[in-house]
Each structure stands twice: as structure tokens, then as C-alpha cells.
A protein has these predicted regions:
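N-terminal, active-site-proximal structural segment of metallo-dependent hydrolase catalytic domains
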Residues: 1-47, 51, 57, 62-63, ...
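Structured beta-strand-rich core segments of catalytic domains in phosphoester-bond hydrolases
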Residues: 37, 42-109
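Active-site beta-strand/loop signature of hydrolases that rely on acidic residues for catalysis
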Residues: 7, 23-41, 101, 130-151, ...
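Conserved beta strand-loop-helix elements of the APE1-like EEP
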Residues: 60-76, 196, 203-226
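Active-site-proximal beta-strand elements of phosphoester/diester hydrolases
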Residues: 1-9, 98-110, 142
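Surface-exposed cleft-lining segments at the edges of enzyme active sites
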Residues: 81-82, 107-123, 158-162
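Metal-dependent phosphoesterases centered on the DNase I-like endonuclease/exonuclease/phosphatase
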Residues: 30, 51, 122-211, 215
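Active-site beta-strand termini and strand-to-loop segments that position acidic
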Residues: 70, 94-97, 221-222, 247-251
Length: 251
């Protein structure tokens, strides 16, 4: 089974930059996107053979997630059932026979870390949500999780030491998640692979210089880690400041 996750930084914009070509060529069983920046009805995109689910933010042109699945889920939920977290369209959960698929766009802590305190509350509540799912059946979490966990996961760790996405607090929360029974699929397969990133700033020719961060993930329940076949980062795909990531797994 092939799963794709991509922060598209605005679905309408990326539609003009080869999104559909990649979507069709990769032929994913499940394709998740983050940062759609759409309200309901603003775009009609329903590829043949896919069930489509959208979760939009109340605020226009902001956040938002979507899932395209060849397999019809048993159930779909939007958000994590906590009101303060559920107005930004950040989470969609699809329940399948053998697993849960959770598509997430984690809140950014922002410059000057103005949202770090909220981010910590989000992390604690979201982790509890995932742990509860994991008691029922295995979980596959994907999305832009807005954190590079270790120094190997970004080009310039020293200069970014206290910046959003690489604070001790955010990194610690990723450690807490993994310690709660989950596995970072990419690092599980490639513990020492360096220089592979999924996001680059639009400034300072960052992508050209590969001055990036690995902040887009497929994280699975530890109970199914042996079923992971590959975890890929499609650095060759443009159209957004992020590139797609892929999980191949036999479930």
C-alpha cells in the first residue's frame, strides 16, 4: 500500500504547478494534503477512483487538510474532539478495517515563539488522542508536524537552535510521542541518512542550496513497524515549499 503526504501551501496555487501530474503518476492508495487554504466549495477536485474528505479552517485562506483514498473508510472524523483545537481544520482521521490513518497539520509555534504555549497544549492533547486510537488498532500518522527532531534533520541546527520547529520544547514533544509507542518511519529505515529534507524556506535560495528541514513525516504504531517497506522523501517534486513524503507498507 502506497501513502503520500504533502503540504501543498495552497491547493489552488499548486494546481498550476504540476500537482495533478504528480497525483496521477504516483498513483497512491491514500493521498493526504495539508495547508489546503480552502473553504468548502472553493475548488472541485475529485479524482476518479477516490473518496475525498476535506477539513477547512474557519479562518479563510488558512490551514486546512484533505484526504483522497481509493479505499472507502469505515468512519471519518474531523478534528480531535477538543473545541479549542478544532476550528483550524488540522486533523482528519480515517478508520479502516486494520488501521487508523490520521492526517495532521501541526500548529506552527510562529516567529518569536508567540504560539509555543498553545503548541505545547496541542501536542499533549493530540498525543493522548493518538494513544487512545492506538489502543483499538494500529495508527498511521502523516503530515507536516512542524518539528525537526534531531540535528540530522535540518541543515543548520546551530543557528536555528531556538527557532520555531527546533526548540527544545517541540523536539521534546516529538520524543514524547515516539516514546508513547510510535515510530518515525524514515528514521526507522534510515537512521543515519543526512541531507534529506522536506521543507525549504522561500528565502535565501534555500532549496537551491538544500538548506532544508525534515518536518513532514509518516509515523506508525510501533506494533506495525516491521510491515514498513519504504519511507521516501520526493525532493524532486516542486510546486510548494514542501515536497511530498511517501510510506510503502504492507497491511
Amino acid at each position: 500500500m502506497r501513502l503520500i503526504s504533502w503540504n501543498v501551501n495552497g491547493l489552488r496555487a499548486v494546481m498550476n504547478k504540476g500537482f495533478n501530474d504528480f497525483f496521477e503518476s504516483i498513483d497512491a492508495d491514500i493521498f493526504c494534503i495539508q495547508e489546503t487554504k480552502l473553504q468548502e466549495g472553493q475548488i472541485e477536485y475529485k479524482p476518479d477512483g477516490y473518496f475525498v474528505y476535506w477539513n477547512s479552517a474557519v479562518k479563510k485562506g488558512y490551514s486546512g487538510t484533505a484526504v483522497f483514498s481509493k479505499i472507502e473508510p469505515k468512519n471519518v472524523t474531523y478534528g480531535i474532539n477538543i473545541e479549542e483545537h478544532d476550528h483550524e481544520g488540522r486533523v482528519i482521521t480515517l478508520e479502516f478495517e486494520k488501521f487508523y490513518l490520521v492526517n495532521c497539520y501541526t500548529p506552527n509555534s510562529q516567529r518569536e515563539l508567540t504560539r509555543l504555549e498553545y503548541r505545547m497544549k496541542w501536542e499533549n492533547d493530540f498525543r493522548e488522542y493518538l494513544k487512545e486510537l492506538n489502543t483499538k488498532k494500529p495508527v498511521i500518522l502523516c503530515g507536516d508536524l512542524n518539528v525537526a527532531q534531531n540535528e540530522i534533520d535540518l541543515k543548520n541546527p546551530t543557528s536555528n537552535r531556538h527557532n520555531a520547529g527546533f526548540t527544545d520544547e517541540e523536539r521534546g514533544q516529538m520524543t514524547n510521542l515516539l516514546n508513547a509507542g510510535f515510530v518515525d518511519s524514515f528514521r526507522y529505515l534510515y537512521p543515519d541518512k543526512a541531507g534529506i529534507y522536506s521543507w525549504w524556506s522561500y528565502m535565501f535560495h534555500a532549496r537551491e542550496n538544500n538548506a532544508g528541514w525534515r518536518i513532514d513525516y509518516f509515523i506508525t504504531s510501533a506494533s506495525i513497524k516491521e510491515k514498513i517497506q519504504d519511507s521516501k522523501i520526493h525532493t524532486e517534486v516542486f510546486g510548494s515549499d514542501h515536497c511530498p513524503v511517501e510510506l510503502d507498507i504492507e497491511l
